[in-house]
Amino acid sequence: MSRTVFCQYQQCDTEGLDFAPYPGELGQRIFAQIGKAGWQAWLAHQTMLINENRLSPRDPKHRAFLEAELQKFLFERNADKPEGYVDPLGEE
């Protein structure tokens, strides 16, 4: 049986994650307050950030940037796209 959470990203009740996808307190907050669809939206946004900004997940500064963006994207809903970004699907 799946868990239901009130997703802070989607602002509705939805299917919760199966496990904390991130370490520490932030991971527990994501597990408790973000649904599967919200997490998938973050993964797509994170991929765009990594590609457009040429980030390396191995670089501590880049990881800190991504963590800050994760919090803005999921909980504050005010994450920006990189300057000059053009959606390849034209959905913007």
UniProtKB/Swiss-Prot annotation:
InterPro entries: Fe_traffick_prot_YggX, Fe_traffick_prot_YggX_sf
GO BP terms in the entry: cellular response to oxidative stress
One function term, GO molecular function aspect: iron ion binding
Segments traversing the membrane: none
Tagged with keyword Transcription: no
GO cellular component: cytosol
Coiled-coil annotated residue ranges, if any: none
Keywords noted in UniProt: Iron
One Pfam family this sequence matches: Iron_traffic
The UniProt record lists the keyword Iron: yes
Superkingdom to which the source organism belongs: Bacteria
Family annotation (PANTHER family): FE(2+)-TRAFFICKING PROTEIN-RELATED (PTHR36965:SF1)
Family: Belongs to the Fe(2+)-trafficking protein family.
Function: Could be a mediator in iron transactions between iron acquisition and iron-requiring processes, such as synthesis and/or repair of Fe-S clusters in biosynthetic enzymes.
Protein name as annotated: Probable Fe(2+)-trafficking protein
Lineage, broadest ranks: Bacteria, Pseudomonadati, Pseudomonadota, Gammaproteobacteria, Lysobacterales
